[in-house]
Each structure stands twice: as structure tokens, then as C-alpha cells.
Amino acid sequence: MFVGSFTDKKPGTGIHVFDFNTKSGEAQLLSEVDSIINSSFLKLSPNGKYLYSVIESQLQTHGKIAAFKIDSNAGDLKLINMQDCGGRNPAHIEIDKSGKFLAVSNYTDPSLSFFEVDETGKIKKIDEFFTFTGSGIVKGNQDTAHIHSSNFSLENDYLFLQDLGSDCIHKFKVNLDANQNMSLQKADAIKVKPGSGPRHFVFHQNGKYGYGINELSGKVSAYALLNGNLKFLADYNAYSKKQDSYRSADIHISPDGKFLYASNRGPNEDSIVIFSINKSNGALKLIGHEPTYGEHPRNFAIDPSGQFLLVANQFSNNIVIFRRDVETGKLQKLPQELVVNGSSSLQMFTYSH
């Protein structure tokens, strides 16, 4: 398990590597990466050989993206290289199925940086760069466009961007030439309800549905996906209590496609909401809420076996481990908590030795 974190805007221990036991749900620290600033979002390559991290997020200067080679036997990371992201505050990394192309969402300078990766995991210089303008109705959060994340469709033929500031989902057609070089072509944007603030998104494994977590409205939006088009189906409240302001954060679907989870930040909330998924029509049914036993659950992950869910509580500096009931979707907290200052991103991979 790989943990990214905020280092309080100064060099520090930004990435932690743990060995996670998929029988007991216990974790043991293997290694750390020091002297990096705000390695706040991580993404594994599809083959598990490389780890990519945003660096220097939430600063007044351009952020960077770093590539690391993973030694899965020792649990060590070796820096391969870094590249400038071309904008401030990179918030998210997406990788296509081939592992050859990276999309970085820059939040403060609303833009998308598109990179190619070579066969050694090294990131080449920016291949394509797109900027965005726009605004929304929520003062402060929506004074300008804010690209928070991106997702390739399961067929790798479209890329969808969540624009928290403009209340829309930007769509790009993915083009591959004869040499398998990828380029992006801007297509229509999908407008969402004013004041929603789309943040993260996930596609269902059946390829028919997608679900977005809206930070500012505290709702999960369900969409039908057909021929690259997203059609809005319904909104579902993610919070258990009414709030003056909402701060929903992350969203994931269990490996078996039966349950959807989303994290909610905020006073008297800090919870994971649990929904069951109707695979025939994409509808969600509320199962319940589970407290995260910490403050500000920015990110969470379901382990590849589907038996555990782990939550990174950024403000309380702890990672909480839950055993997941695969039949009911409900969560049960385990005794062990991991202490990681500013924990903000989790990535998991099963290595066979």
C-alpha cells in the first residue's frame, strides 16, 4: 500500500509504503520517501511497476509530477524523474489502460496536462496542454474554473474531466494513430446542477453507468453512459446530516460492482456513505453511514480483494482500516490505525512473490 500526504508545504516525508496483510487487515511500514513537498495524490501504473505522484501541490508555483520505480520485494521506491505540470496545484493523476499516457488535473490554474510515459516509466515533457475558463454560483469555491480530476472511459476512447468551479464535466475524444500515439480532441461539456462542484468520478465495471461525487452539494450523481455520452439519472444525498456547507471528497465502487462508497468531510460528519447499486438501471439505495474515526477523510481505497476499506483522514493524521462485509457492504473498524501526517491519498496493488 502506498500513502501520499501533505507535508505542510515544506520538504518532508511525503510517501509511505506499507505491507498490507489481506487476511488480517494489518499493515506494516516498509519504507518512506523523504525531502519532497506535498505529494498529495498518487496513482499506480496498471502493471504495478511504477508509482506517479503530484509534487508541490497547493503552492504559489507550478506543481510537478514525479515517477518512481517500485521494488515490490523490498517495498522501496526509486525516483525516475520529475516534470513540470504547467500549472499550480496539481490535484489528480489519471493513467490510461496501456500505462503509456498520464492526465494531470491542475486545480488553481484550471488546466489539464497530458504526458506520455516511456517503457521505463519515465515521464516525457508535456505533450498536450488545455486551459479552461468558467465560474459557478458558490462564491469562493466557484469564482473560476477548477479541474479536480479526470477519468478515462473503460474502453479508453473518452476522457472526462470534473470541473468543480464551472459545474460541468468536460469531455475529450481520445484518438490513437497508427503508431498508438494518443491525442485528445475537445468535445461537448456536460453541465451539472448549479452549485454542485463535481470533484471525483468512477465508472461502473459493466461500462453502463458512472457516478460523480459533488463536493459542494454533498450529493452523488448517477449517469448512464452510452456511446461516450453521459446522461444524468439522479442525485443521492451523501451526508447523514444537513450542513451549512458540504465537503464531499472521494468515491469508489467495490470490485464486485455491488456497492458504492463516498467520503464526506466536515464537522459532525466525517463519514463514509454506503450505497448498493442496482446493476440493471444504475440506481443507488442507501445502506448507511460509517464514521471515519478521524477528521477530513480526503481519500480512501478498497483493497484489490474487496475485503477491506482504508480511509486517509488528513487533519487527524490517521489511516483507519475497516473490514468490508462483501454481502451487505457494511464496514467494521479494525483495531489498528496507521499514523501518517497529512495523509491524503491511498493506492493498493497485489504483488505475487
Curated annotation (Swiss-Prot):
Gene Ontology BP, a term: pentose-phosphate shunt
Q: Where in the cell is it found?
A: Cytoplasm
Q: Which gene encodes it?
A: pgl
Q: What induces it?
A: By ulvan and rhamnose.
Q: Describe the family membership recorded for this protein in Swiss-Prot or TrEMBL.
A: Belongs to the cycloisomerase 2 family.
Q: Chief location of this protein? A: cytoplasm
Provide the alphabetized UniProt keywords: Carbohydrate metabolism, Cytoplasm, Glucose metabolism, Hydrolase
What is the name attached to this protein's record? 6-phosphogluconolactonase
Classification from the root reads: Bacteria, Pseudomonadati, Bacteroidota, Flavobacteriia, Flavobacteriales
Q: A single GO CC term, please?
A: cytoplasm
Q: What does this protein do?
A: Carboxylic ester hydrolase that may be involved in ulvan degradation. Ulvan is the main polysaccharide component of the Ulvales (green seaweed) cell wall. It is composed of disaccharide building blocks comprising 3-sulfated rhamnose (Rha3S) linked to D-glucuronic acid (GlcA), L-iduronic acid (IduA), or D-xylose (Xyl). Catalyzes the hydrolysis of 6-phosphogluconolactone to 6-phosphogluconate.
* EC number annotated for this UniProt entry: 3.1.1.31
* Organism of derivation: Formosa agariphila (strain DSM 15362 / KCTC 12365 / LMG 23005 / KMM 3901 / M-2Alg 35-1)
